[in-house]
């Protein structure tokens, strides 16, 4: 049991390593965009500001797509064979899950108190995952789907058809 917990912890640690680097880049960009620190060179209409804005937006990728990051990286540590294939299976299953939730919400969202017509955002119960407007399941949904995908992969990978 302890080995399984350690494998899960190792699989969760892989994407977390990227958080530190991305956070540092965001912090540096924020400093370089501050006119209080940098002076007039950091005014919002200058090329200096716009270049650092581009770099900062790129650095936000890790935090904006954290669900996908965990869905793809969890099978790296937990799949017993063919890790890359397990990652692809996990990603496809997660996208399928979100498309199915989106279809359910577009038809019957009002029954559960979700207005699917509004924009996805904070406090709405909706999120945009891989450009799919869906129910905001957060990290829990990503980890559950990735866990199911890895379990299915490990159980049925060697099964002959």
Where are the language model's segments positioned?
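Early transmembrane hairpin of solute transport permeases
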Residues: 2-160
